[in-house]
């Protein structure tokens, strides 16, 4: 009712219909664990070679390499703005995939992978990045891949329960260039001008969950957003 009243019957109905469609599934490969994936600094502009070795049937040289990740046997095209991003035709049971638990890839919406393209123009490799609202860690792991071994990502999450999930995902990703903190943002103000980049994916209205979770729609209200 709120959507229809705010957008009108035509646009409102179109939005409601879109929210009822199955969201596309996409994953992002881990360059540190998939041989031939994009090098640090190439992920954000789509110039990295097609992932090979552990990640695809052919290496960047075109020679035969070990079998691809099983999850990519279900690939349904590349994510245009992320060299390591792939759409999947159907959603597999990720919890049963050892590659998922080993951090060989991260399940992440293609729209979230676009942040790498936004940051890419600044030259991310070797930079110090503060991810201020980091849990559960999807963007943190992307920043870690972009920064490379000479960079540093400080992933901050004030909610300690969510910070544990963040730490688990960072550990699986395995790049070794991420520090997880649970500071109040004002505490990090003491590091003025120390970071090269600050990323803030702030808590918001939650509308991005509407397509994934019917309960999120049922619980949404202007009052909850203001909270």
For each predicted feature, which ranges?
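S-adenosylmethionine
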Residues: 1-227
């Amino acid at each position: 009712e709120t959507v229809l009243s705010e957008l009108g019957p035509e646009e409102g109905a179109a939005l409601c219909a879109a929210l009822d469609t199955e969201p596309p599934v996409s994953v992002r490969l881990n360059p540190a664990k998939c041989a031939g994936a994009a090098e640090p600094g190439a992920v954000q502009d789509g110039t990295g070679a097609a992932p090979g070795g552990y990640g695809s049937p052919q290496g960047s040289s075109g020679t035969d390499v070990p079998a691809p990740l099983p999850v990519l046997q279900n690939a349904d095209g590349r994510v245009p703005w992320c060299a390591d991003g792939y759409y999947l035709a159907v959603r597999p049971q990720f919890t049963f995939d050892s590659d998922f638990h080993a951090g060989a890839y991260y399940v992440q919406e293609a729209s979230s992978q676009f942040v790498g393209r936004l940051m890419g123009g600044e030259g991310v490799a070797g930079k110090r990045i503060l991810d201020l609202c980091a849990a559960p860690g999807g963007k943190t792991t992307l920043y870690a891949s972009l920064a490379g071994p000479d960079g540093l990502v400080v992933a901050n999450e004030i909610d300690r329960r969510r910070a544990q999930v963040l730490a688990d995902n960072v550990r699986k990703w395995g790049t070794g260039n991420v520090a997880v903190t649970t500071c109040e943002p004002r505490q990090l103000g003491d590091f003025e001008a120390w970071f090269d980049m600050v990323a803030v994916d702030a808590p918001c209205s939650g509308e991005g969950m509407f397509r994934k979770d019917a309960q999120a729609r049922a619980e949404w209200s202007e009052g909850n957003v203001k909270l």
